[in-house]
Amino acid sequence: KQFFQTGNNLTNAVALSGGSEIAQTYFSYTNTDARGVEPENKLQRNNFDFHEVAKFLDNKLTVDGNVNYITQKLNNSPAIGFYSNPLTGLYFFPRGMNIAPYKNYQVPAAVGGNGAPTQNWPFIEDVQQNPWWIINRNTNEDDRNRIIVNVAVKYDFVPWFSLQVRGNVDRTDDDGDQKYWAGTLAPLAAPNGNGSWNGFQQTLQQEYGDILGNFVIPVSTNLKIDGVVGGSITDNVTSGINFGPGAGSGYGLFFPNLFTIQNIEVAPAVALGGTSGSYGSNVRTDQPYHNQVQSVFGNANVSWKDMIYLTLSARNDWSSNLAFTPDDHYFYPSVGLNFILTKMLSLPQVISFAKIRGSYSQVGNTASQYQTNPVNTASGSATVLNGTAPSSLKPEQTKASEAGFDARFFNDNLTASFTWYKTNTYDQDISIVPLSASGYSSGNVNAGNIQNRGIELTVGYNLINHGPLTWNTTVNYSKNVNKVIDIDSKDGINLVDLTPGNNNYDTYVSKGGQYGDLYVQTLEKDAQGRLVLTPDGNGNYFPVQGNGELNGYSDVGNPAPKFQLGWNNSFTYKNFNLNFLLDGKFGGQVISVMQGMLDYYGVSKVSGQARDKGYVSIFGEDQTTGKTVTEIDPKNWYTFIGGRNATLGQYVYSATVVRLREAALGYNWVVKGSAVKSVRLSLTGRNLIYFYRKAPFDPELTSSTSNSLGGVDVFNQPVARNFGVKLNLLF
């Protein structure tokens, strides 16, 4: 309570529209001013949107233009993990001490030092710092300017054919930095104690253009054909510079807390992987990237008596990322078929509508950039890096099949929708280090056949649908089964580590398993399931580390749920409306590195309870005598299983969670005889109540947007309960 604050998000928007039959104009402005639950975490955003549509030549020519401009400033984006994260010091702080004096996060410079203030904190270790020091002296800032311009020109030559040309430019300029002030502990700041500074300036620009021929052919009264043929080009350019030695590089600032490029230490090339005697600089690094995709495509929709619908599509892409390979292009078709049973068959009157559907599709994806030919990379020295990939890389391909039905009953009061699907993704682009027998340090290969199979079911019913009161309830059910059919058998690769270098866990893709299976260290057990214990010589015991099946680690599950269930209810009564959504994810496993460290430091609730009792209850076996042991010393237990290298097999939790996801209450006023036509006031809430949760954190939170870190808690940000008020005025 002494550190966190109440976050808020204030959004104001105004929109104007007007026009005639010939031209329509739309303009809007949205301002967002937000602050997070951590102090100094702020976001400011302005969004301007202008849209104009005009028709000429007896409405045959349509010109459509849109400009969207966004400015954004983000300060102190919250961190996860051990470093630059105020939660570590906050959570590790002893419960018997008063943290309030440390809000004064810095103290005057020490005699004989560099003259810079130092950090006011009683503990010296790399995984924790003063929380207020981090938010004020380990600051980060990101400024963004983005402009999106869309132009489309369409001409209707005849009633059944039109030609359209479209163009789009999307440019984003980012300018950001991370400052580590003198007094910050290693490895974030330089060993010389003067602090460090890292920054970047980056521009991403995408240019897109296409030409489309749209046709509608009424072959007969019963048979209709419509579709589109065309081609497109997408060009992406990324450029920018980075400056600064980087946290943990061993280099920093010449003079303390002077954040200028001229004050950044220059590292010798040998420190950057170059050769002895060469010159280098880690002040600036150019990052030019350029790729292009050229495409031709077409699709056709055929309908018969508005009861049978056939959809066909085909697309071929040529990608610059596949240059120097035998297959620089990839073709992917699709087909879909729908039958409207209520028009084809004489069904009971209770069936208002019934449709069955099925489809098959292929989707292609290009390889990673600059992976098909050796390139010279400037990395602060004259050294040419030797990472590459073979010229036999192929595009990734996903094949998907789907079938289902949609139905409505009792005058549309009861609705049901069901979908079965199966997807297989082949030839995924993965990095292999080292790339054996190639002469290069690393490279990419095509690998994998990852399958997803599942079902989705939605059932809704209007329980009350007459008079001033209505009530609609909807239930959603979904289930997905993931399986790694193959990785790269032809090259003898049956396992890929997605998280190499982690302290005490790994996520793997292994043949026969699921994507992102969690592997951790576990404790050894005997045939009866008892923990194997070794005496400590003082009448107590230590557990014994197990020998996992993969590099000492054991498979403890996957964070993906077995199934998901949601229940939504919507009520209206005159001008009032109420909505609430309950949902749950059932099954799966997650792990908490944070809980292991809190236990090790003795600041968790369970470690405190164990100290009060004087023991931890276990089911173990003395490996020297074979006798059953039911109690173990808390210090021996938590110092062995906890800490940064925790035995995470003891910190595996069910990922099942059931919550009141959101609720909203609104009221509408209709105003007469005023410039204001209507007023709507809404009260909203999200993450309101947990009905069931066993994990010490929200299982839906991840340590990264990467798929490889799902279900892993490494001092993730706490979940916030959100309340909102929204006012809409229509003039």
Locations of regions flagged by a protein language model:
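Conserved small-residue
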Residues: 1, 79, 234, 241-256, ...
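Surface-exposed loop/turn segments flanking beta-strands in extracellular/periplasmic regions
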Residues: 1, 83-133, 181-195, 239-282, ...
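Outer-membrane beta-barrel transmembrane domain signature of Gram-negative proteins
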Residues: 1-17, 21, 146, 181, ...
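Outer-membrane beta-barrel transmembrane strand signature
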Residues: 1-17, 22-30, 104-156, 269-299, ...
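Transmembrane beta-barrel strand/turn architecture of Gram-negative outer membrane proteins
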Residues: 20-107, 141-175, 196-244, 314, ...
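Extracytoplasmic gating/loop element in the C-terminal half of outer-membrane beta-barrel translocons
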Residues: 186, 319, 585-680, 685
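C-terminal beta-signal and terminal closure region of outer-membrane beta-barrel proteins
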Residues: 382-383, 447-452, 497-530, 603, ...
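Membrane-embedded beta-barrel scaffold of Gram-negative outer-membrane proteins
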Residues: 395-439, 478
